[in-house]
Amino acid sequence: MRRAIRELGRVLKNVRVKSLKWTEIPIESADDMVLFTQMLSDGVALDELRFDQNGHENTQAILSSVDLSKYKKLDFEDNHLRTNGRADISNLIALNSPLETLLLSSNSLNDVDAVLIAESLGHYSHLRKLDLGYNNILERGLNALIRAVNDTSSLNALSDSNHSCHLGGLHGSVINENQCENLNRIFKIHLLMAERYRSGEGNVQYLNREIVGSNSVLLAPFIIESVHRRHAAIEEGGLAYSLRDTSLLGLLYELVKDWEMPDLFSFNN
């Protein structure tokens, strides 16, 4: 094994070698694993690593010992990985490294891991796909992950959510499926306002709570205009099917009729 790792290390010094697949080859010797992790750190041009079905100990050694900040894609699926509270995964995401794809399905990650990962997604990240399917993540962890990418507690919270990372492997997750971060933000804000409108509660009571201050009335024209602008952007982005149960005129009429209009005209006068 040690000889094979050394030979592989020589190969990885070639700048044309961009990816490495190491599947179902668990490394039993601690010394060999140290050599392997050093090899990964020294890889000149490596930016993709598939390391699956090799067990928890080997995977944890990579997470804790290898400089993964240069990788664009990491696949650690089916390793029975459990972190025992360690923050290696969430720290990697929060680094704002070039990492775009992180595959962690079929492991033993739990709610504590999910909460830490959710917190890391709150920071700006290049991550575009995170697969956490078939882990031990229950309601608490799932809710934390969903809030990280779709916090509907207020329009401001939703706007500040992560709009770039698609959470794969979670039941019913269609959030952030579009590759355009700005379109994901537009879609989610418009969907929240449409859901409030369809529920019968409307948007006015929420806007009165979420947009406060003596000059909030000045924002009214911009809010109303943005409703139309988001609707148009969603149609142009090929997501018009998602608007079939929403009346743009209904949304606009509610705002014009009930929100800030008397104060706005009084202010202008």
Q: What does each model-identified segment do?
A:
Residues M1-N269:
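Leucine-rich tandem repeat or coiled-coil scaffolds
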